[in-house]
Design a protein with these regions (language model features):
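Active-site mouth loops of central-metabolism enzymes
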Residues: 11-29, 73-78, 149-162, 215-222
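Alpha-helix-loop-beta-strand connector modules within alpha/beta enzyme cores
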Residues: 55-81, 112-124, 140-147, 193-218
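C-terminal alpha-helical cap/extension of soluble enzyme domains
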Residues: 122-133, 149-162, 192, 197-242
Length: 242
C-alpha cells in the first residue's frame, strides 16, 4: 500500500487541501465539533495578524491539535516578524503564513527561520514542536521537519502579485491570497490591469504560481465557494466553520 503523503507532500503534489478556522482559545471538544462538520478538512487555522496573540494559548491549542492529529496553520503577527518564525514553530504549528509579503528579503528571511540547517538557520528547541515526541534525535527531527512543515507567503497588493516570481523560491510551498488589503490597493491603482477585479488578479496569480512551481492558497471562507476557487487553480483553501 502506498504511503499517504504528509502535509507538505500533499500540498506540493497539488492535492486539494482544505483548512478551517478555529477560535484561538478553542478546546479539544470545540475543535472536534468543527472538524466533525466536514470530513474534507486537512488542517485548522488560527490568526494573530488581526487578533491578540497569547503564546501559551497558541501552545495549548497546538498540543490539543497534536492529540487529534490535525496540523495547525498560524498566520504571524506582522511581515517584519519573520525572525520570530522559529520561536512560534517551537510552540507547535505545522504551517506558517507571513502576511503582506512584498520583497525578496522577507521571503528569504522567512525561509531562513522556518527551516533547520543546512537549508535554513532555525534554532533547535521547543518541547511542544509537532512531531518531536516521535523524533527526539536532532538529525532525525530536523530532516523530518524540513520535509514536513509548510511555509506560505501572503500577497496583498498589486506589486506583491507582480513580485510572485521573485518571492517564489525553494522552501516556499504556497502563495496565499489577501483579498481585503488587495481590494484597497486595487482601488488606489484603478488603471492597472490587475485592478479590474479580484477574480482577474487571482487568474493572473494562478498562472504565475503554476509557472514558478508554488501552489495558490485562497481564503474562500464560505464552503460553497470551494469549487469556484479550485476551478480557478487554487489547491489550498481556508474556510470558516460550517
Amino acid at each position: 500500500m502506498a504511503k499517504e503523503p504528509n502535509l507538505k507532500e500533499r500540498i506540493r503534489q497539488g492535492i486539494t487541501t482544505i483548512g478551517v478556522q478555529v477560535p484561538s482559545n478553542a478546546t479539544k471538544s470545540q475543535i472536534e465539533d468543527i472538524l466533525g462538520r466536514d470530513d474534507e478538512y486537512n488542517y485548522i487555522s488560527v490568526d494573530s495578524q488581526h487578533n491578540p496573540l497569547h503564546e501559551p494559548q497558541l501552545q495549548a491549542l497546538c498540543v490539543v491539535a497534536q492529540e487529534l492529529s490535525i496540523p495547525v496553520h498560524f498566520r504571524i503577527k506582522h511581515t517584519n516578524y519573520t525572525f520570530q518564525i522559529g520561536n512560534w514553530l517551537d510552540l507547535g504549528p505545522s504551517i506558517i503564513e507571513v502576511p503582506q509579503t512584498e520583497t525578496e528579503h522577507t521571503a528569504q528571511e522567512a525561509v531562513d527561520y522556518f527551516y533547520y540547517r543546512p537549508f535554513g538557520k532555525r534554532s533547535w528547541g521547543g518541547q511542544t514542536r509537532v512531531g518531536i515526541s516521535e523524533r527526539s534525535d536532532i538529525s532525525q527531527y530536523t530532516s523530518w521537519w524540513n520535509e514536513f512543515g509548510v511555509l506560505m507567503l501572503q500577497v496583498e497588493s498589486i506589486q506583491a502579485i507582480v513580485n510572485i516570481p521573485r518571492l517564489a523560491r525553494e522552501g516556499v510551498d504556497a502563495i496565499s491570497w489577501g483579498p481585503a488589503d488587495l481590494g484597497l490597493d486595487r482601488a488606489e491603482h484603478p488603471h492597472h490591469p490587475l485592478a479590474e477585479s479580484d477574480d482577474a488578479a487571482i487568474n493572473y496569480a494562478s498562472k504565475v504560481c503554476t509557472d514558478t512551481g508554488v501552489k495558490l492558497m485562497i481564503r474562500n471562507y464560505d464552503w460553497k465557494l470551494r469549487q469556484k476557487y479550485i476551478d480557478m487553480g487554487a489547491t489550498v483553501l481556508l474556510e470558516s466553520p460550517k
